[in-house]
Regions:
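Interhelical loop and adjacent transmembrane-helix boundary motif
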Residues: 1-10, 169-211, 216
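Transmembrane alpha-helices
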Residues: 24, 109-112, 116, 120, ...
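Non-cytoplasmic
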Residues: 72-74, 150-188
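Membrane-interfacial helix termini and adjacent extracytoplasmic/periplasmic loops
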Residues: 3, 64-101, 171-175
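Alpha-helical transmembrane segments of multi-pass membrane proteins
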Residues: 13-21, 55, 59, 135, ...
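Transmembrane-helix boundary motif in ABC transporter permease subunits
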Residues: 21-52, 65-67, 115-117, 122, ...
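C-terminal transmembrane helix and the adjacent membrane-cytosol boundary/short C-terminal tail
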Residues: 44, 113-124, 128-129, 199-229
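Hydrophobic positions within alpha-helical transmembrane segments of bacterial inner-membrane proteins
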Residues: 19, 23-31, 35, 61, ...
Length: 229
């Protein structure tokens, strides 16, 4: 397609596939955790908040290593997934999805939590006074009012997933057509003789996609602020 080589197209396609699936699976969990952190008071809340945000402060290689010892074929959990279901994250695009979801998760939670925090608790109290159940309040009040924040979190997570490298290459290596996303392919081309042009093209694609995602996220965040007022 145009001036992209097949390996470049494969990396772009795999990156979009991995990022999309990662966000689809991580978003419901991020919404739930963000709601808990925003609306509930319980012992261990700060601990949960710290665990959620660990991927923001730990080196990605450390996250990749933790995934390796927990979710690989011989990992603490991964071995049972393999023995019972024949399912493995090791050396496959599924592992890239998992590592991308983990790295994007705290950004999604932060954005969605801010949206929940902006909702006036008095609205929820009024809804409960009128007989609405907590579940109905969540789906008819909390979620619609925080929708822009949820989408902004998803967009930020998508951008972070596209840029994920350290955790992915540590967990599932750098295998063409399997785990070689844009950052991994860029790394490979940089180390390959005469790979400068391919690296530059992938770099340009990554910048364009990231700018679009960040612009969309900022626009949605501003919209959420105006709507909250």
């Amino acid at each position: 397609m145009f001036f992209f080589s097949q390996p470049e197209l494969n990396a772009i396609y795999l990156s979009l596939k991995v990022a999309t699936i990662a966000i689809l699976f991580a978003l419901p969990v991020a919404i739930f955790i963000a709601w808990i952190l925003s609306r509930k008071q319980f012992w261990g809340k700060q601990l949960l908040n710290g665990i959620v945000h660990l991927p923001l402060v730990l080196p990605p290689v450390v996250i990749g290593y933790l995934l390796l010892i927990v979710m690989a074929k011989r990992g603490a959990i991964g071995q049972y997934l393999w023995e019972w279901f024949g399912f493995s994250f090791s050396f496959s695009w599924r592992g890239a999805v998992l590592s991308s979801a983990v790295m994007a998760f705290p950004l999604m939670v932060r954005s969605i939590k801010q949206a929940f925090d902006a909702i006036d608790p008095k609205l929820e109290q009024a809804a409960r006074t009128l007989g609405a159940s907590p579940l109905k309040v969540f789906f008819t009040l909390n979620l619609p009012l925080s929708f822009s924040g949820v989408i902004a979190g998803a967009v930020l997570g998508f951008a972070r997933s596209l840029g994920e490298f350290g955790a992915t290459i540590t967990f599932v290596s750098n295998i063409p057509n399997q785990t070689q996303t844009i950052p991994a392919a860029l790394f490979t081309f940089i180390e390959t003789p005469d790979g400068e042009l391919a690296a530059a093209r992938l770099c340009a694609i990554a910048i364009v996609i990231s700018l679009i995602a960040l612009s969309a996220s900022e626009w949605l965040a501003e919209r959420q602020k105006r709507y909250a007022k």
